[in-house]
Amino acid sequence: MTQWYPASPALWQGRDDSIEAPDARRLFQTVTRSETFSPENWQQKIALMGFACDEGVKRNAGRPGAAGAPDALRKALANMASHQGHERLVDLGNWVAPTPDLEGAQQALRDAVSRCLRAGMRTLVLGGGHETAFGHGAGVLDAFAQESVGIINLDAHLDLRQTDRATSGTPFRQLAQLCDAQSRAFHYACFGVSRAANTQALWREAQWRNVTVVEDLDCHDALAQMAQFIDKVDKIYLTIDLDVLPVWEMPAVSAPAALGVPLIQVLRLIEPVCRSGKLQAADLVEFNPRFDDDGAAARVAARLGWQIAHWWR
C-alpha cells in the first residue's frame, strides 16, 4: 500500500541572509511544511508533493533511481531566493510507492491530486518517473470533470506506448483511454519530441489521437502553436520530462537526449502556460539523482520548478 510521509525539515535548509533585510529570504524560509496531508487548510496555495516511484521506469527497461528525486529536488530548491509566488508553496510531503504496486501508487496520487484541486489548491508534483503523469493527469481530469483539460508535455518521447501493463512510457495512452471511457475529448500536446526516439507506430498513434506534436528541431519557433493550444482548453496540466533537455544540461535522467531542447527554450515555451490563468497542475519527472555527481543537474531541474511557481497565475 502506498504510504504518505511529511517532508523532512532537514531538506529545507539554506543560507540565512535575513540580517541584511526583511525580504532577503530563500525558499527554505518561505515554504510552509505541513505535518499532515490536509489540503483543505491551504486554499489558494500551491501543493508541493513528491511521488517517490520509479517502478514504471523499471518496467520500461530504464535506469532506476527517480524514486529519490523528490527529496533531492527539495534540497536544490531550498537555497534559491524567494520571490513573488514562492510564498504560496506548501510542502504536502511524499507519496512513497512500494515495489511493484505501480497501479496502487498511481491511484493514491490521483486521489491526492483531485483532493487538492477540489480544495482550491494547485499542484506541483516532483516525480518519480513519467508514470507520475497518469496519476497526476487522472486527478486533474477527476477534479474538472465538466471542463476541457489540456495536457501539455515537454518531452523527447510521446509516451503513447501500448503494453500489457502501465510503465513510464504509457501515461498518455492511459489518459487517452480514460478520456475515451468518460466520453470526453483528449487534448494532448507534446513539445520537444525526438523523431529518432519514437517509432513510426508511436507517430501513427499520435496522428490518430490528433496530438499536437512539435519536434525538438522546431521548438525555437513554437510559441504560436503553444498559444493556439492554450486557447482551446479551459484548464491545463503541464508535465515536464527532464529528458527533453540536452544531455549536457540534463545527464541525470533515464534516457538522456543527444539533441534535446535547451533550458532557455523550454522556459520560453512554458512562460505563457504559467501566466495563462488556466494552469492547475504541473510536474517535473524523470530526474535521477544517481547520475548527478555534483548536484548541477538538480539545480537545473529546480530552476524549472522555481520558475513555474514564480510565473504561476
Swiss-Prot record:
InterPro entries: HutG, Ureohydrolase, Ureohydrolase_dom_sf. Its EC number is 3.5.3.8. The keyword Metal-binding applies. Binds 2 manganese ions per subunit. Gene3D superfamilies: Ureohydrolase domain (3.40.800.10). One of its GO terms (molecular function) is formimidoylglutamase activity. Pathway: Amino-acid degradation; L-histidine degradation into L-glutamate; L-glutamate from N-formimidoyl-L-glutamate (hydrolase route): step 1/1. Disulfide bonds: none annotated. It catalyses: N-formimidoyl-L-glutamate + H2O = formamide + L-glutamate. It comes from the Bacteria. Coiled coil: none annotated. Keywords: Histidine metabolism, Hydrolase, Manganese, Metal-binding. Pfam families: Arginase. PROSITE patterns: ARGINASE_2. Its cofactor is Mn(2+). Belongs to the arginase family. This is Formimidoylglutamase.
